Amino acid sequence: MKATVLAGLAAVIAAQGVAGHATFQQLWVDGEDKISACARLPLSNSPVTDVNSAEIACNANSGPAAEKCTVSAGGVVTVEMHQQPGDRSCDNEAIGGNHWGPVLVYMSKVDDSATADGSGGWFKIFEDTWAPAPNSNSGSDDYWGVKDLNAHCGRMDVPIPADLAPGDYLLRAEVIALHTASSPGGAQFYMTCYQLTVDGEGSQSPQTVSFPGAYSPSDPGIQINIYQKLTEYVSPGPAVIEGGTTVEAGTGGSTIPAN
């Protein structure tokens, strides 16, 4: 009987994990839906789990997109995540299965965003991570970036820093799911890279990190038990750059109406 119960529980957990797989698929620029024109879509909705893999940059098997999306420095892009390719229904969670964790966005200055391979330097422009909920005794009951994403049809508004130098960039949108992250290798990384051209007259050229290299499996924001009471959450990777955006979890999302 005990073995049967344990096997059943394992099956439920496994099914929950698969149900929660997702990808960032679409992009909006200042409220205009660009669909997936400039998204380097992964071939599956499965996560990357090895932070030392080359796939941690722009996901697995993600070839160049059809186009580049143009945005002005100081403008807003909206990244959009869903569980299944082509499904933009707001009736389904963007990423289900209690895949709580942060939403992080990076950019990389490149010569040509249509051909860049993601191996260049990255800087963080946005994060919506964690905040404590009143009377919570478990991190899973707290506020998370993923919960903000789910509450807004998978969409998250991401301001482009106003002083960013013009040119081509890759934009890397990422969810780190922490539901099985209490041991090394348990965190799940869901990312997509978008091909951008940034217009403007800025001059900001931030310091960068590399993917792989920016994360370690034992980083406190990657190896963490979110089912215990949390008093803090340390966001993985570098700090958000000057002029970037840090959103308090529970307040993030998008102003684009649900369809």
Curated annotation (Swiss-Prot):
GO BP, sorted A to Z: cellulose catabolic process
Main location: secreted
Keywords, comma-separated and alphabetical: Carbohydrate metabolism, Cellulose degradation, Copper, Disulfide bond, Metal-binding, Monooxygenase, Oxidoreductase, Polysaccharide degradation, Secreted, Signal
Localization per record: Secreted
Residues the record lists as binding Cu(2+): 21, 99, 190
Practical applications: Lignocellulose is the most abundant polymeric composite on Earth and is a recalcitrant but promising renewable substrate for industrial biotechnology applications. Together with cellobiose dehydrogenases (CDHs) an enzymatic system capable of oxidative cellulose cleavage is formed, which increases the efficiency of cellulases and put LPMOs at focus of biofuel research.
Similarity comment text for this entry: Belongs to the polysaccharide monooxygenase AA9 family.
Name listed for the protein in its UniProt record: AA9 family lytic polysaccharide monooxygenase E
